[in-house]
Amino acid sequence: MEAKLTVNGFGFVARYGEKDVERVLLPLLMWLTELQAERDRRLIAFLAAPPGAGKSTLAAFMEWLSRRTPEATPLQAVGMDGFHCPNAYLDAHSFVDEDGREVGMRSRKGAPQTFDVEGLRAALADARSDAPAPWPTYSRVMHDVVAASLPIRKKILLVEGNYLLLDEGRWKGLAELADYTVFLSAPEALLRERLVARKVAGGSTPEEARAWYEASDGRNVARVLVHHSPADLELALGADGSLTVA
C-alpha cells in the first residue's frame, strides 16, 4: 500500500505491505479507536523507536490510514522533535557524555540530553484538555524549533519519538502520560545501514556518514535499544521493511 505523505515539510511516498497493514496496522488503529471511545476523551499513544527505524513515516502513515478507514477515529501524528532545545541553548551548554567527556550540546544534537523533557511533559499533560495549546515543531529547513506551530485537533494523538520510553534520567516515567505505548525495534546493523545511507543522501560522503554514526547516531541507537521500558505493543522491523508483532 502506498501513501503520499509530508513529514517536516518534505513530501515522499511511504510503502507498506498489504499483509502488514491488514495484520498489524489496521488492528492497532482499531484498538486505539476502541480505547478512545471507552475513555471518552483525547487519547494519547506513544510510538517509540531507535533512530533509523522509520517511526516518523509510520506515524504519518497511521494518520493517513485513519482518514481512509471509515470505522476508525481519525488520529493526529505529532513528533517530539519540536522539543529539541533551541540551537541558541545548545550552543551555550554542554553535558558529560557516555565516555565521561564534557561535550558541547550542539555537537550531539539529537541525544537525550538535548531535549526539553519538562516542556514535553507539560505539553502531554495539557493535550488532554479540551483546548490544548499548539505544539512546537522542528524545521528541517532551518534546523531549529518553531514554537507553537501545530494545533492539536484530533481525538487520538499519536506521539512519535526516539526517547519516549527511555527508562533513565529525566525521561523515566514519561510513559505514564500515555494511554497506550508502541515500541518499534530493528537490528542494529539494519539501523546503521539506513542511517548512513540517509546521511549520504543528504550530501555527506560515506566516510563522513560512517564517522557521524559512530560518534552520535550509533550511540543513540544503542541507548534506545538497550534502555527502553516495555511497551504495550512491541513491533519488529525486518530488513525488507516488513512489520511483525514481536
Q: What are the functions of these language-model segments?
A:
Residues 26-38:
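Pre-Walker A adenine-sensing motif
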Residues 1-24:
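Charged, amphipathic alpha-helical linker segments immediately N-terminal to NTP-binding catalytic cores
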Residues 142-198:
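ATP-dependent NMP and nucleoside kinases share a basic, alpha-helical "lid"
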Residues 58:
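Hydrophobic positions on the alpha1 helix immediately C-terminal to the Walker A/P-loop
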Residues 55:
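Conserved lysine of the Walker
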Residues 145-148, 169-172, 197-246:
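Small-molecule kinase domains that catalyze NTP-dependent phosphoryl transfer to phosphate-bearing small molecules
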Residues 52:
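Walker A (P-loop) phosphate-binding loop of P-loop NTPases
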Residues 76, 83-139:
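Conserved nucleotide-sensing/catalytic segment adjacent to the nucleotide-binding pocket
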